[in-house]
């Protein structure tokens, strides 16, 4: 009996030891496997994750620099938000085609919740039936080629007003082009939306700028979305709530005034379209939905178009040969005409090359807008959990040296034989993003860049003030969701 018990004890000990060894081997194997399948990433800190790597730099450049070291598909832990970053045309094409629907959502943000009426605008709306209907309205009604064309006369009129204002300021005196161009685009969009410029233009402009400042995606509320107390401690919730009250007051007054005067208008404005659809049986819109969409038009339209014009002029000032070439093309084609019509400049190839090259180097949204994974995805062997944020670094993609020779240089001629318009065939050129969540306002945005830029270059010669050499122009970028100049563009016109 003792021998049996001894054997049983030995057997049990052996079994436990064997089980322990097998469990250790299993855990080691699965851990090794998991490690092998983890996306490359920099070293991280507790709580904040990888945020410290982005301190002291603009997000798009900071993320680009990390990608150069850790790869064009990498993982970042931004606070409590797992994030994958795409920085190459190859991975952008793979994800925005094969996995486009899996990453069709937008992350919920405090800004979207408060300022954009619970994310009911086109840009931040979650993927689903509501978003599909909004996208359809944009494509067929608000931002169709026909609708964009219908605003041609007001674009021409407002561009001519800008020319007259600059001339009135006097030759040889510095002009704040940043301020003037932003005001021009805001006025064009105001008239397109409401049928006229609005008396509270300055207030609307400040609201739009504040919204853009709050949507950078890297502040406390964005990286710790579940820590509600931080939203209060940081002051962001209070700022956004105050901003929301201003928006409600301003847009409610505009809509009320517009409704009273609707019988006197002949051209259907963007607000007319939305009010017509408001009580539609097919897809009714609420008043808050309409306000969110109007904010999209201004927020996405004003800053992106004005900054593109600023960057184009900045690059041309820095590159006198390109400036001379585009001005010669304009002046030859227009042959002394006083006012420019859009038909006059549609076929001006070098002007269009300048715009494309500007958008390559200075995409309006350098990190586009983040997407979010709707379901777990296996991406090239990597397991991507649900709710993972996706950042596509268009800034890095547009400057990828594997696809672009002298990628950091401003060379409009590189587009001479290119058919790329708003997207490159290999996703090497993505100024407006790609896939389902691609910017629906590309046609309107390009129209609001081409004519103003042509007027500014055709009617005036430009130089830096105080005898500063062209190669000393400040090209520093600001930090935020959109790619703006850090300093305002002050230039001296002659005519």
Curated annotation (Swiss-Prot):
Alphabetically ordered keywords of this record: Endoplasmic reticulum, Glycoprotein, Heme, Iron, Membrane, Metal-binding, Monooxygenase, Oxidoreductase, Signal-anchor, Transmembrane, Transmembrane helix
Consequence the record notes for mutating residue 479 to F: Altered artemisinic alcohol oxidizing activity leading to the accumulation of artemisinic alcohol
Bilayer topology: Single-pass type II membrane protein
Cellular localisation: Endoplasmic reticulum membrane
Pathway terms, separated by semicolons: Sesquiterpene biosynthesis
Enzyme class: oxidoreductase
TM stretches of this protein: 7-29
Reactions this protein catalyses: (+)-amorpha-4,11-diene + 3 reduced [NADPH--hemoprotein reductase] + 3 O2 = (+)-artemisinate + 3 oxidized [NADPH--hemoprotein reductase] + 4 H2O + 4 H(+)
Mutagenesis or variant effect for residue 483 to V: Reduced activity leading to a reduced accumulation of artemisinic acid
Effect recorded for residue 369 to M: Reduced activity leading to a reduced accumulation of artemisinic acid
Cofactor needs: heme
Disulfide bridge map: none
BP terms from Gene Ontology: sesquiterpene biosynthetic process
Lumenal side, ranges: 30-495
Free-text biotechnology note from the record: Artemisinin and derivatives (e.g. artesunate), are antimalarial drugs due to their endoperoxidase properties; they also display multiple pharmacological actions against inflammation,viral infections, and cell and tumor proliferation. Artesunate may be a promising treatment for COVID-19 mediated by the severe acute respiratory syndrome coronavirus 2 (2019-nCoV) (SARS-CoV-2) because of its anti-inflammatory activity, NF-kappaB (nuclear factor kappa B)-coronavirus effect and chloroquine-like endocytosis inhibition mechanism. Yeast (S.cerevisiae) has been engineered to produce artemisinic-acid, a precursor of the antimalarial artemisinin compound, by expressing AMS1/ADS, CYP71AV1, ADH1 and ALDH1 in conjunction with CYB5 and CPR1.
Residues bearing glycans: 176, 261, 267, 386, 417
Example of a GO MF term: iron ion binding
Topological domains annotated Cytoplasmic: 1-6
Induction behaviour: Strongly induced by gibberellic acid (GA(3)) leading to an increased artemisinin yield. Accumulates in the presence of trans-cinnamic acid.
EC numbers, comma separated: 1.14.14.114
Site annotation Required for artemisinic alcohol oxidizing activity that catalyzes the conversion of artemisinic alcohol to artemisinic aldehyde: residues: 479
A Pfam family matched in the record: p450
Purpose of the protein: Involved in the biosynthesis of the antimalarial endoperoxide artemisinin. Catalyzes three consecutive oxidations of amorpha-4,11-diene to produce artemisinic acid, with artemisinic alcohol and artemisinic aldehyde as intermediates products, but is unable to oxidize germacrene A. No activity with limonene, alpha-pinene, beta-pinene, pinocarveol, (-)-alloisolongifolene, caryophyllene, (-)-alpha-gurjunene, (+)-gamma-gurjunene, (+)-ledene, (+)-beta-selinene and (+)-valencene as substrates.
Name the UniProt record assigns to this protein: Amorpha-4,11-diene 12-monooxygenase
